């Protein structure tokens, strides 16, 4: 049963939407736009034409209406009850720009794939971006979660970030303003990142290519990159590895319905066929509960879970076996 009413929300925005150039879709299926290929409907999905269009749209949306943004849909688990309010899905046309803007500096739009900035850096002999070649997703997500891999992190390269807040006001944030820590930024949660400036350093192209090849080979060997997955499921606890804790607790290959902890890399959760959002999240909480029981460590989700549970299908953290 449908849990959202997008047309009602669209009507409430009034005549101002006629000036909006982007695409507005009521009751948009989220399973078509996320890497897990699971979950319910977005009450209203908006794909802005560009930053000006995004600003104009946000000024129309009442403050009490929830707004969230997605990029390419990686690292995202949508619950089956759908997402109330507005989901903003940035488009490659308006937010996928990628260009050199100064010596060793690259400007990247929020929807630009992470691997593309690595490739551009290689083409221009700019070091420090090799690690992006192994990160699924887009620059906006990397900025929001301080994405990193293979010894590199986003915070090491960011110079400034351009963003729009919930009310449609524009902001420019410095690296310090972003307040980066492990897989986290202190930047306001309502900020929608539109693009950013990154800085690397001169480096021999052969060295960059070697590092990128090593990242690619490692990823292809140990990660289920051809499966329907959101990437790393849980953050690594300090001084430990999530996959190792899961493996020791018996979680490798565990299945619930169509959801499975990958036998190849057990910190990757995969949709083996037609898994629901409920099955994926229930599997994740089952694994958290097992790790807690086995090692006493509370794994934290790295994948972002959004939306509402279907009535009668609510899931408690650690399946209620601990104070989450």
From Swiss-Prot:
Xref: InterPro entries: FAD-bd_PCMH, FAD-bd_PCMH-like_sf, FAD-bd_PCMH_sub1, FAD-bd_PCMH_sub2, MurB, MurB_C, MurB_C_sf, Oxid_FAD_bind_N
Active site annotation, chain numbering = 183, 232, 302
Q: What is its main location?
A: cytoplasm
**Membrane-crossing segments per the record:** none
Question: What Gene3D superfamilies would the database entry show?
Answer: 3.30.465.10, UDP-N-acetylenolpyruvoylglucosamine reductase, C-terminal domain (3.90.78.10), Uridine Diphospho-n-acetylenolpyruvylglucosamine Reductase, domain 2 (3.30.43.10)
Keyword Cell cycle annotated:
yes
- The enzyme class is oxidoreductase
Q: Catalysed reaction per UniProt?
A: UDP-N-acetyl-alpha-D-muramate + NADP(+) = UDP-N-acetyl-3-O-(1-carboxyvinyl)-alpha-D-glucosamine + NADPH + H(+)
Domain FAD-binding PCMH-type, which positions?
A: 36-203
- One Pfam family from the record: MurB_C
One CC-aspect GO term: cytosol
- An example of a Gene Ontology BP annotation on this entry? peptidoglycan biosynthetic process
List UniProt keywords, sorted A-Z: Cell cycle, Cell division, Cell shape, Cell wall biogenesis/degradation, Cytoplasm, FAD, Flavoprotein, NADP, Oxidoreductase, Peptidoglycan synthesis
Q: Which PROSITE patterns match?
A: FAD_PCMH
Localization: Cytoplasm
Biological or metabolic pathway of the protein: Cell wall biogenesis; peptidoglycan biosynthesis
Query: What does the similarity note say?
Result: Belongs to the MurB family.
What is this protein for, i.e. what is its function? Answer: Cell wall formation.
Q: What is this protein called?
A: UDP-N-acetylenolpyruvoylglucosamine reductase
The organism of origin for this protein: Sinorhizobium fredii (strain NBRC 101917 / NGR234)
Q: Quote the gene name from the UniProt entry.
A: murB
